[in-house]
Amino acid sequence: MAFRNVTFSYETNRRILHGVDFIVPAGKTTAIVGPSGAGKSTISRILFRFYDVDGGAVTIDGQDIRDITQKSLRATIGIVPQDTVLFNDSIYYNIAYGRPAASREEVEEAARLARIHDFVSSLPEGYDTKVGERGLKLSGGEKQRVAIARTILKKPDILLFDEATSALDSQTEREIQASLREVSANRTTLVIAHRLSTIIDSDEILVLEAGRIVERGAHSELLETDGVYAKMWRRQQEAAEAEKTLAGAIADGALRPT
């Protein structure tokens, strides 16, 4: 998958992406990070063809996605978004929606890979458990695992994780991240992330700022460069440490939660 010198604007007088150029090799994981408004989510919308590019091209296996029907393109890509949409039906139905013709064994195997099978099996009604409107009967982490299982079952050529863990607490995020690492192994994967701790194992990290790629490389390389990525990393590590200290103080009774 490749973005070739892509430019894009939602409005004619305000360009969002400026010459974005990168390749995600088959079976590798590329992460895109950057501040809010940098254009990260725009990249996922373009890949899914909610919008077409103004200049340049997006290709999959060398073919311009503008020459592919939206139906076949979206069959090629499996997305796990930040806000998972679940139907007011059973857990089984919500997973099987990824590929309705799948067998029960395939649905349960997808759930195992997403690390939700044991939880579902422990419920009185198991896979027949109703999730409620928009999945309100499940926690945020459980909903994301259902979404991951659904995407695994779909067996897409490309995986897209669009801020898939950003709305979760730190502990749940770590657990979900372990699932994502397992699922994305040897698959062509694009990860759009806010928390840098979730993408340190990526083969390549792209740092997007004001619609331009300003840095690229592996996690260790970007830290050595001591540029935009390194500053973002330090800020997030300091914030995480402060949060941990505060939680410890509350647990020790030195502070009371407000």
What are these regions (language model features)?
Residues 1-258:
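ABC-type nucleotide-binding domain
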